[in-house]
């Protein structure tokens, strides 16, 4: 989905909670070529009576989400995820252990610092829903996070040899992919480099993607997907 005004979920007339996890350059031919334009499209999920949660993004993008919320729902409806509440315990290809006050010890089956931030968005959303009267048990939250899977997001396909598949396709995603290679894969090789198999659609910023990943490449094989 495109996430916002043109997304299929926008058929919901009055969502209880609208969450904008982050805003970056993506689907620019449809959403616009600046962050404020993209944010304006994302803001299409904000409806009267909705509580709005914003994760992260450039100040000019957040300003659009906040202003739209203020205009449609009132200033009291706007909330922002506080990532400083995250405390990392340990992380590996097997998953991530962390705490997020006041939920206590939690675990993700996924790795990557961005998945911690996604989890923080989820936990903040749970708090906002509880404020609205929804009964969401702590055990359900813990079990949900521990069992959550996200295909093609630094997904470990094989252990011997280690093969990881990542569908990152915008600058924000590639930055996360680069950080994951540096943290999880580079330490497992003598020279800190890995073999890359890479294919990029024509409308993506492939130059930025290649520049970010090239320092970790022992070899590169490219494919050309239909686009």
Feature map (PLM): residue ranges:
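Active-site glycine- and acidic-residue-rich loops that bind
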Residues: 1-3, 59, 200-202
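Glycine/threonine-rich flexible loop motifs
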Residues: 3-9, 29-32
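Nucleotide phosphate-binding/pyrophosphate-handling subdomain across enzymes
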Residues: 6-19, 23-24, 37, 99-219
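Acidic, Mg2+-coordinating active-site environments of NTP-dependent enzymes
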Residues: 15, 20-102, 119, 123-139
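Short hydrophobic segments within beta-strands
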Residues: 55, 197-199, 223
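C-terminal helical cap/extension that packs against the catalytic core
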Residues: 58-77, 93-94, 162-165, 171, ...
């Amino acid at each position: 989905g495109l996430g916002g005004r043109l997304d299929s979920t926008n058929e919901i007339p009055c969502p209880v909670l609208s969450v904008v996890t982050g805003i970056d350059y993506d689907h620019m031919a449809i959403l616009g070529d600046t962050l404020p334009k993209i944010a304006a499209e994302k803001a299409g999920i904000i409806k009267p009576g909705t509580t709005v949660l914003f994760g992260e993004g450039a100040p000019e993008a957040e300003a659009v989400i906040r202003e739209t919320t203020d205009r449609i729902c009132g200033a009291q409806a706007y909330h922002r995820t506080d990532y400083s509440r995250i405390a990392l315990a340990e992380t590996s290809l097997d998953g991530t252990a962390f705490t997020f006050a006041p939920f206590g010890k939690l675990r993700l089956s996924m790795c990557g610092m961005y998945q911690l931030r996604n989890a923080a968005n989820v936990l903040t959303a749970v708090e906002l829903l509880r404020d609205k009267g929804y009964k969401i048990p702590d055990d359900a939250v813990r079990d949900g996070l521990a069992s959550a899977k996200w295909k093609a997001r630094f997904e470990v396909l094989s252990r011997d040899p280690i093969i990881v598949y990542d569908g990152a396709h915008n600058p924000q995603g590639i930055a996360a992919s680069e950080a994951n290679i540096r943290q999880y894969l580079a330490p497992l090789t003598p020279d800190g480099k890995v073999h890359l198999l890479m294919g990029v659609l024509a409308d993506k910023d492939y130059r930025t993607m290649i520049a970010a990943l090239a320092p970790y490449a022992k070899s590169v094989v490219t494919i050309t997907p239909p686009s």
